[in-house]
Design a protein with these regions (language model features):
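Alpha/beta-hydrolase fold nucleophile elbow
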Residues: 131-141
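Short alpha-helix in the alpha/beta-hydrolase fold that links the catalytic acid
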Residues: 194-204
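Alpha/beta-hydrolase active-site loop
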Residues: 108-129
Length: 271
């Protein structure tokens, strides 16, 4: 390859890196409990105003060990921004000096307490931005973040809710569960970490307010990009109570979710 060609490729790579750096902006978002949250903001093309979606990480936190967004979060954020959504990813654990919580039984950061406050604070912050349609903000989360979606589902000001494989038992035990906006629940029918049964029962009780999608044979984390199914150990809470659960990609379930969720959200935030 010629020197000129190599130089051109180097310039192109530098421009791409600069564009990506501009696309992923670090912002500071006040939680309703007063905590200042580190958050990543990704804006679609155009001045807007655009619909927006808040993405809530699971018990492992928002970022990979490298410091970049976890591959699942990065994948979804890129796809949703490409579909015209402003995307905000607050980090609930590191912002409070805490690490991953998957193996922690005595958790200091809970879906119905700190993380609900974070979700509402993120909504407040987005609603104040001139490039966001304040009436078109959705909330979406995975596992611990999905449980947070359920905990915040009674709050006004959201256009839609999406929860991937949440823990549904607490919501099911509540005297009433009435989402303030449509809720989409997606879970693997073989999930042995949070378990599908409470979520299925919750959806049946809630009626038309909740859409339940169960994927036969899929485990926890089925929508992750290229994650081989494996058995995790040492987890704090699992279906069997022995600290073990399977996680990993299910290609068919992932493909369905990647097509279903953006379309479903677009329908709920349409003008």
């Amino acid at each position: 390859m010629s020197t000129r060609r190599l130089a051109a490729l180097a310039v192109a790579a530098a421009l791409l890196a600069a564009a990506q750096a501009q696309a992923n902006e670090v912002v500071h978002v006040p939680s309703r409990d007063g905590t200042v949250l580190n958050a990543v903001l990704i804006r679609p093309e155009g001045a807007g105003p655009h619909p927006a979606v808040i993405l809530l990480h699971g018990c492992g936190g928002r970022d990979a060990r490298s410091g970049a967004l976890d591959p699942r979060h990065a994948d979804w954020a890129e796809r949703l921004a490409g579909a015209g959504f402003v995307v905000l990813l607050p980090e609930s654990f590191a912002s409070r000096g805490q690490g991953p919580q998957c193996t922690v039984r005595d958790r200091r950061i809970l879906p119905w307490r700190e993380r609900r406050a974070d979700a509402l604070g993120a909504r407040d912050w987005l609603a104040a931005q001139p490039f966001v349609r304040a009436e078109a903000i959705a909330l979406m989360g995975w596992s611990h973040g999905g449980s947070t979606v359920l905990a915040a589902a009674d709050a006004p000001g959201f256009a839609a809710f999406v929860a991937f494989y949440p823990g549904c038992s607490r919501a099911l035990r509540a005297a009433a569960f009435a989402p303030a906006a449509p809720l989409l629940l997606l879970i693997g029918e073989a999930d042995d970490w949070t378990g599908p049964e409470p979520c299925r029962a919750l959806a049946e009780r809630a009626g038309l307010a909740v859409t339940y999608v169960g994927y036969p044979g899929a485990y926890h984390g089925f929508d992750a990009p290229g994650s081989q199914v494996r058995l995790r150990t040492g987890l704090a809470f699992t279906v069997r109570g022995d600290g073990t659960a399977h996680v990993g990609t299910d290609p068919a379930a992932r493909a369905d979710a990647l097509a279903r969720v953006p379309s479903w959200l677009a329908e709920r935030v349409r003008r």
